[in-house]
Amino acid sequence: MKRSGKIFTTAMLAVTLMMPAMGVSANEGNAAAEGNEKFRVLVDSVDQKNLKNAKQQYGVHWDFAGEGFTTDMNEKQFNALKKNKNLTVEKVPELEIATATDKPEALYNAMAASQSTPWGIKAIYNNSSITQTSGGGGINIAVLDTGVNTNHPDLRNNVEQCKDFTVGTTYTNNSCTDRQGHGTHVAGSALADGGTGNGVYGVAPDADLWAYKVLGDDGSGYADDIAAAIRHAGDQATALNTKVVINMSLGSSGESSLITNAVNYSYNKGVLIIAAAGNSGPYQGSIGYPGALVNAVAVAALENKVENGTYRVADFSSRGYSWTDGDYAIQKGDVEISAPGAAIYSTWFDGGYATISGTSMASPHAAGLAAKIWAQYPSASNVDVRGELQYRAYENDILSGYYAGYGDDFASGFGFATVQ
């Protein structure tokens, strides 16, 4: 489930009159490197004196200690710095939105608009008549995304942290404005509480929201900002002695060492990390990072269509590798579980609601379920909760969609993890 060098947000809009679909592909540095336009670089050295001098000369965006520091510079500065044999320097992946699809999903759209309870909530609760959800109390869901509308009536009661990591050096507290929509939508699927009673419910409405803005208002961002937020969530879990589920509805076609090391750091601190599998299906070996990492749970997207007695894995949902079928073991590049991700109705940045498709939408359903499970078993570890997700998925096999089949398959993973 590997792809080659791009970072993207993994949502697709179900209707064309909303914002462009989330699919962020990495700029290899071509356009950003022209003229005096600045871009992000990672600088490191075994010689601390040289590293200190470079920090003083260029300034620091984020300091990753043993991994070096990041800063912004133009092409001329970058080329000059590369000639310094005492330093190693590389470009940090830049993210930019790319439309995943502009094909209207009229049938899904009509279904979503006609239901007060999103189909994904009914599906994950395995209850077609449910109108209100519950659970997740005492658990924090850190949504690393474009920010969140913390004044949305369905979300404002859940907000505990609101931080902007795109400014660098340190985060900006009480600043996580979402002008794009993606992050607000993701947060809603995870933990919306229905607001005044006329809104939507997420999977775990009693959970607390940590809204971490790591992507800009256009849906673009840098790997170092994401890595800094991941590490901060891990540090907060330790400092506050609390349980944290990170949701990352974003991804990369190539692995970033900064993000990989940050994921490992926070996972080892007891944080459970959920990530979108990506929207490059149905092709084999297309799982994006960080979902492809062993210490992250990659979530595939299901659509509201039943075949062979189960929901169907969406064609757009990224697939793993056929040779991992049936092993019930998580390896790099595996899809782990599945959740609703096609035509998902949820909260929007303007205070209203929108319908979007993508593995970006599947991931927060799984994150909400993880929070709900953890609240039920507060003494459990992140590894325990992950095992419970796998077990529940195993109990609810997915048999529909390209490459889906009995047991652990490379389309749906272990299956569809549900509340009951």
UniProtKB/Swiss-Prot annotation:
Catalysed reactions, semicolon-separated: Hydrolysis of proteins with broad specificity for peptide bonds, and a preference for a large uncharged residue in P1. Hydrolyzes peptide amides
Membrane-spanning residues: none
Function: Subtilisin is an extracellular alkaline serine protease, it catalyzes the hydrolysis of proteins and peptide amides.
Protein species of origin: Bacillus sp. (strain TA39)
Protein name, as recorded: Subtilisin
Keywords noted in UniProt: Calcium, Hydrolase, Metal-binding, Protease, Secreted, Serine protease, Signal, Sporulation, Zymogen
Record family assignment: Belongs to the peptidase S8 family.
Native organism taxonomy: Bacteria, Bacillati, Bacillota, Bacilli, Bacillales
An example Gene Ontology molecular-function term: serine-type endopeptidase activity
Chief localization: secreted
Enzyme type, top EC level: hydrolase
Annotated catalytic residues: 145, 182, 360
Gene transcribed to yield this protein: sub1
GO CC annotation: extracellular region
Superkingdom of this protein's organism: Bacteria
